[in-house]
């Protein structure tokens, strides 16, 4: 028992000796001061760090990097728009409220007062169409001299298509000259098809200067001038004259083209079918004779003794046969000369006209 106690004393002494050697090698162990923990927030000041730069390296492990409280307090009531940078080395950009980041709201433009045009659709219903009073790109300005030399400005509007129920759906755009308020008078028959539309024209003196009647089916404007049309033309209204020419000339051209197209359908129905030839004839016999030019066929042969002439047309053979017989049926009434061909007589008469 005594030996065991002696061994324990030796072991304790050896361990205490080794502990003292370890303390001499490593140095004193630093202890934390409770007052230093309370002043942790003030450890970020440069004076504290400069006083003890690296004496206690263990203290730097307990430093918690945080942004200054004044920065956090200034942003407490503001909504977070972007991620917050908590580093000390980067300057913090000032945050803008969410209301300042929104697009500016433009006030709406005040609506323009439209003009109303009353269009009577039947005996008891009236439909109004709105036309803006401001000048649109489709508006045309024209000036004229009124009574007393006072200039009058005419505005040529284009009435847009008015979406009306049932019978008024066939109306289209109509150019007209307006001075105060244009009126479009429309009469509808009982069968439901829209009739002609009469549009009045207002002159420089404020009186009616004619009217334009438009057929909705063909949309071909026709002009019917009134009694005061001559005075309106004499007053030198350039706007009215240009508008009347615009409505009158296309109507005449369309009317003539319509008659010509009907005439072509009735008469010029025989057309040559050879490539590159566009000849059209009113009779099939003329087309048949024309086709012989392409084929080279000459069925008409001269029967005079010793003559071998052939012709593609019978009138050419008759004209040639007069050379053999000497017959000259075409006689001049001024000089009693005779010719075998009618075209020769026409050339001869021109000489009398020039003398």
Curated annotation (Swiss-Prot):
A zinc finger (C2H2-type) spans 270-294, 300-324, 330-352. It comes from the Eukaryota. Its main location: nucleus. Disulfide bonds: none annotated. There is a cross-link at residue 64 (Glycyl lysine isopeptide (Lys-Gly) (interchain with G-Cter in SUMO)). InterPro entries: Znf_C2H2_sf, Znf_C2H2_type. The keyword Ubl conjugation applies. GO terms for molecular function: DNA binding; DNA-binding transcription repressor activity, RNA polymerase II-specific; RNA polymerase II cis-regulatory region sequence-specific DNA binding; zinc ion binding. A motif (9aaTAD) lies at residues 82-90. SMART domains: ZnF_C2H2. The keyword Flavoprotein does not apply. Transcriptional repressor and activator. Binds to CACCC-boxes promoter elements. Also binds the GT-box of cyclin D1 promoter and mediates cell cycle progression at G(1) phase as a downstream target of focal adhesion kinase (FAK). Interacts with corepressor CtBP2. Interacts with PIAS1, PIAS2, and PIAS4; the interaction with each ligase sumoylates KLF8. The 9aaTAD motif is a transactivation domain present in a large number of yeast and animal transcription factors. In KLF8, the motif is inactive. This is Krueppel-like factor 8. The gene is Klf8.
